[in-house]
Amino acid sequence: MTGFNWHNPYPTTRIPVFARNVVSTSHPLAAQAGLRMLWKGGNAVDAALAAAAAITVVEPVSCGLGGDAFALVWDGGTLHGLNASGVAPAAWNVDYFRRRHGEDAHGLARKPTRGWDTVTVPGVVAGWEALHAKFGSLPFADLLEPAIEIAERGYAVPPIVAHKWAAAVPELHALPGFADTFMPRGRAPEVGERVCLPGHARTLRALAQDGARAFYEGALAERIAAFARDGGGALTEADLRAYRPEWIEPIGKRYRGYTIHEIPPNGQGIAALIALGIAEHAGAAEWPVDSPESQHLQIEAMKLAFADVYRYVADPRAMEVTPAQMLDDAYLAERAKRIDPARATHFGHGRPPSGGTIYLSAADERGMMVSFIQSNYMGFGSGLVVPGAGIALQNRGHGFSMDPASPNVVAGGKRPFHTIIPAFVTEEVDGRTRAVMSFGVMGGDMQPQGHLQTVVRMLGYGQQPQAACDAPRWKVNRDFTLDVESTMARATVDALAARGHTIHSIDDPYMDFGSGQFVWRLDRDDPERGYVAASDSRRDGLAAGF
């Protein structure tokens, strides 16, 4: 069935959940919203969409109606990928940003972190619509009922959401629409305080009545575009009307007898696959679990992966190389040879052969499994909220490069480099592909790093999903310094430092090391045997099922 060691050697506040139908999210009310759909006879996609809508209400610090989404759906026989990330307004280019924001010390146009010049077309609502049209079984309006109810009646804010909410207020409180929506008492809500989001509820009711396309055409789209126009933003009704999500073929990489699947670029999921390939060639799982030798090899593999991803990944229409070239096994084997087992190294990018959220998972007793992620990017996104509508607009445009030589250079109608990545695991048995696990780890640059670390723990070391969730994590920063959770063994940290890693021990895991949700199928041939689900204690969520 699994071959897991069900012992959990790490401190935890969660237990794995065994059930025939499961939903695992970062907020209990969102998990309950998903379960309500399954109780009504809906499928895993219905459950995932209900949970996704609910979590825009109860965790607005991470996602909202103005964000983006990606999904991987196992329909019982085939894995489908959806890219619902938005594109730049048609007016954007490097000169646009240079005129409005000047140049930096390197002569490149400056790009802001918040405000209108970070707002790309929101893709999440169109993503919900696409998923429902292809796989949903309940009426779309039914899926929004729990979210509407929570937004109108209110909910008590849990500790981690309250912490992130308070941290965002000093930077965002003066931006248009933010305080009216998210500071009804003139401040961030405290733990346990009741919050209602009436504007958000009205928008959800409009989507339930008129369909998700109403977000992109008609009165609601006009309202969004007018807000942009009044604020000096470039987003127009034409930008909204032209947007469509894309069904795409997932990419995959073999690892220890399984295939790990990710969404292809413009997302960074390929970083996890590159790192897994390099780590396997380097023999990371041949050392004891949690040993400094294993951790060092995984860290170096991740650094090599990021070096390539930051150089090559962009909107696929602008990339110089293909994902297949970046994942070429011979190329990854050569990259693995660059790792010094005794020393940390700062790597440059290679030359492949020619040729950043909330995450949730749902699965049902009929065998359908969903790996879904949505995000506003940095906290509340741009900080801009459409007045009276509760639509917090993302700041995903900050992910573009201003370097004209980069494949990720900003351009109208183009998708930026994206951090959010759902994942999935399958295996081949007797010529048939079988579903194994839907999973994801939210949290900016931590996402592919979380994928690497948890997959190595489960598939390389046989740790059960909850243990893989609870284990201490490390995070490679963009300057190649290393953050580690304070729960990591001191001997391991000292041994990594002796290898030359510049290490910062972090006592606040909630903000830095991501949060995962995992659903593992117990019997690949019989979905009625059910699943085991795990939810990360670094957020307020849980796994639930029946």
Task: Indicate where each model-derived feature is located.
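Extended C-terminal subregions enriched in glycine
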Residues: 318, 414, 451, 460-510
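Glycine-rich phosphate/pyrophosphate-binding beta-alpha loops
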Residues: 261-269, 357-361, 371-384, 440-447
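Noncatalytic scaffold domains of N-terminal-nucleophile
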Residues: 1-32, 36, 44-210, 215-217, ...
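Short, small/polar residue-rich loop motifs at catalytic or cofactor-binding pockets
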Residues: 247, 354-357, 418-420
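Internal maturation/activation junctions in enzymes
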Residues: 281-376, 389, 396, 507
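Active-site rim segments in enzyme catalytic domains, especially the processed small/beta chain
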Residues: 57-74, 78-83, 234-236, 368-433, ...
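M16/insulysin-pitrilysin zinc metalloprotease superfamily fold
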Residues: 269-285, 425, 434-436, 443-469
